[in-house]
Amino acid sequence: MAGYTKRELSIIDTAYRIFIRSVSKVMDAEQIGYIDKAYDLALSKYDGRKTMSGGLYVLSLIEMADIAANEIGLRSKTVVGIFLHRITAVSDVSLDYIKEHFGERIALIVDGYDKISNIQTNNVSFQSEQFRKLYLSLIDDIRVVLIKIIHRLYDMRHKNDVDAKSFKRYLKEVKYLCIPIVHRLGLYELKKELEEKVMIYEYPDEFEDIKRKIRVSSTEQEKLMEGFLEPIRNALDNEHIDYHVKWRTKSIPSIYEKM
């Protein structure tokens, strides 16, 4: 691994160890070993590769793996898929090698990711039913879509890692493909973040204006809700009914959409 400096290897190793400690509570030794194997291959094949902003590409994979395992709650096969999802496209690693060393399911995930990444999106609208059908017809495993969504979430969080032309296309992909899918999967926190990222990049002034107004009016909103809930709580208490009240402010994109 001549492409890394000693300091870079130390940074990567520290980040990976932190990640492994975080997932060792929910994954057994066999699953951790499976992830280690994929990470080692990625570390070797992405030898010294950098992102556009100058960061280490392997660190971006570790962050994506963390999103998968710790933010969404996905398991070892998805994490392995993340470490390997572009490896056949950018290195000499073949699908046969992936199948032999990681199993047929991971090979299908890697192949599926390559297929959806190779769709010529310049010739088809992201909003069209034709595109959605084409996209889904190429997928044999839902984890392919989840890895794509995780990768796009990473891109939205790290705009400087992506060139301007690609980022513009990724925004459309997030808006018309990723967000509807995560909504159907019930991943509402992820949906909220993706919607907010899209609005921040498309309508930054409007986003900040609504955010400011929410902050200014938050105390008044809380008083209003408490006044509304008080008679409901009293009625429930009188009937000795156990309950838990939840309420939330609508997301900024949702507020903007209704303006």
Locations of the language-model features?
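Active-site helical microenvironments for divalent-metal-assisted chemistry
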Residues: 1-259
